[in-house]
């Protein structure tokens, strides 16, 4: 009986710990946006859910941003944040099929580009490596090889730049 209780408690602690790591990485990504030019529309913070239920809002990307120019049009986009401790056998599992489908539906419904920020190694609030890719480039795979992410590698401490002509986040 005690082993079952201990295992359940350990699982719950691990789940909360994983959500805390997710929240730290999301906060790290948000800080890479210059507040002078980017407005945080929505932050769907990583939070544990009760009884295995996920609210509908949590199926959408973690962050919605706007590039804002004084007196000009606003350019919206979203970012899904994923931090992983390391690559395993040269790859990571980044999302379940239903999550990826949900991100695609969000992108199509709202007609705004979705990007995926992937931090590897270090700590969630200070990853060793950072990759930033358009969802359109990876939505066919829930496992990503390190070699596939190389073109999207960026310096982890560099602020983001959004090219509203090409709809690309750098």
Model-derived segments and spans:
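Non-catalytic C-terminal interaction segments of nucleic acid-processing enzymes
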Residues: 1-7, 12-13, 17, 24, ...
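Conserved alpha-helical elements of sugar-nucleotide-dependent glycosyltransferases
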Residues: 21-29, 98-102
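Acidic carboxylate-rich catalytic motifs and surrounding loops in phosphoryl-/glycosyl-chemistry enzymes
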Residues: 44-47, 115-123
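Short, flexible/disordered intra-domain loops and linkers
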Residues: 14-15, 50-54, 87-95
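A short acidic/basic microdomain associated with nuclease active sites
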Residues: 31-58, 62-66
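Conserved catalytic cores of phosphodiester-cleaving nucleases, focusing on short active-site segments
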Residues: 33, 61-87
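Aromatic- and glycine-enriched beta-alpha-beta binding-site module
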Residues: 78, 102, 115-118
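Mg2+/Mn2+-dependent nuclease catalytic core
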Residues: 84-107
């Amino acid at each position: 009986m005690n082993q079952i209780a201990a295992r359940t408690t350990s699982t719950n602690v691990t789940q909360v710990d994983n959500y805390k790591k997710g929240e730290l990485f999301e906060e790290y990504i948000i800080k890479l946006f210059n507040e002078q030019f980017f407005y945080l529309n929505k932050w769907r913070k990583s939070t544990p859910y009760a009884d295995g239920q996920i609210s509908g809002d949590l199926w959408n990307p973690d962050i919605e941003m706007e590039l804002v120019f004084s007196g000009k049009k606003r350019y919206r986009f979203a970012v899904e944040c994923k931090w992983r401790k390391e690559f395993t056998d040269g790859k990571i599992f980044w999302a379940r099929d239903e999550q990826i489908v949900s991100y695609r539906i969000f992108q199509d419904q709202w007609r705004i580009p979705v990007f995926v920020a992937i931090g590897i190694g270090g700590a969630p609030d200070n990853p060793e490596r950072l990759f930033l890719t358009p969802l359109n480039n990876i939505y066919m795979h829930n496992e990503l090889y390190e070699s596939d992410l190389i073109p999207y590698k960026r310096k982890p401490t560099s602020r983001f730049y959004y090219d509203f002509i090409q709809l690309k986040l750098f």
